[in-house]
């Protein structure tokens, strides 16, 4: 819940409140396919990435479906792998599985930040990331990268052999690496080239999600980052959603027509 009052808003307005409602229903592959968010091949590819040690960054704007895709992807981690999630503010992931007798069947730890005015008592995502590395995780889920410290800490976790899945606000797949770089640059005095190389190495796969005009949510593109040379990002588009037409029905409701295709189609 986010609330604003005067003097931020006009006195005659009173209070402005925004409530983020988390859907507690488990996201399934069938639901993602039914909604047209992705194809079966795309979801199987992302599952293989997480299961076999390839870190993934999911990008998009607010309400684009980043958290939904990430929650489903983390739910694909096998029961014998240790999964630790880090979230800021509120819990959105519930990935603990139980068997028919109610016993916990997988190895999952959910961690949450605890802001405090006293720096010694403040528990942020950067602090939790450092602690997580001592717990021998197979997969680390970072709710969202917002600061320089957690941006680089998450990247270094990936570069040291851990599988990381995280989200970030970005306008496209390709611009996601630069967004991560500019976040890290707020605190660390490294060149653009060094930071970009770190991010490309840390997150070989980037997924971009978007909410279209008809309010449907799609994975718009999946790319593989291959390198950064002479100020240019080198990448390969693996899957992409192409919009064929935008229509408006007799009730004034918009409809987007399109399809997912492989990068080499």
Model-derived regions, located:
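P-loop NTP-binding catalytic core
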Residues: 1-52, 97
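Flexible glycine-/small-residue-rich
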Residues: 5-7, 19-21, 87, 113, ...
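Switch/coupling sub-region of P-loop NTPases
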Residues: 54-56, 72-201, 210-211
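Hydrophobic anchor at the beta1->P-loop junction of P-loop NTPases
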Residues: 58-60
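Walker A (P-loop) phosphate-binding loop of P-loop NTPases
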Residues: 63
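Conserved lysine of the Walker
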Residues: 66
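Conserved P-loop NTPase
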Residues: 200-265
């Amino acid at each position: 819940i986010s609330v604003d009052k005067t003097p931020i808003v006009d006195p005659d307005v009173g209070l402005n409140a925004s409530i983020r409602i988390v859907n507690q229903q488990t996201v399934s592959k069938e639901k993602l396919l039914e909604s047209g968010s992705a194809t079966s091949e795309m979801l199987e590819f992302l599952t293989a990435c997480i299961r076999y040690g390839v870190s993934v960054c999911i990008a998009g704007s607010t309400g684009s479906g980043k958290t939904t895709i990430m929650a489903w992807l983390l739910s694909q981690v096998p029961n014998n792998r240790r999964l630790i999630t880090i979230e800021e503010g509120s819990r959105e992931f519930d990935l603990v599985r139980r068997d028919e007798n109610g016993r916990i069947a997988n190895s999952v730890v959910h961690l949450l930040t605890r802001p405090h005015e006293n720096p010694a008592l403040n528990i942020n995502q950067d602090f939790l990331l450092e602690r997580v590395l001592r717990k021998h995780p197979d997969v680390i889920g970072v709710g969202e990268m917002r600061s320089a410290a957690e941006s680089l800490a998450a990247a270094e976790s990936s570069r040291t052999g851990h599988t990381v899945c995280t989200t970030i606000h970005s306008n496209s797949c390709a611009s996601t690496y630069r967004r991560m770089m500019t976040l890290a640059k707020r605190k660390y005095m490294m060149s653009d080239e060094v930071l970009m190389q770190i991010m490309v190495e840390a997150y070989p796969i980037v997924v971009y999600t978007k909410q279209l005009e008809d309010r449907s949510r799609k994975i718009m593109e999946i790319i593989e980052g291959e390198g950064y040379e002479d100020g240019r990002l080198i990448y390969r588009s693996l899957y992409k959603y192409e919009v064929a037409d935008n229509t408006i029905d007799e009730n004034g409701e918009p409809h987007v027509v399109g399809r997912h295709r492989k990068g080499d189609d």
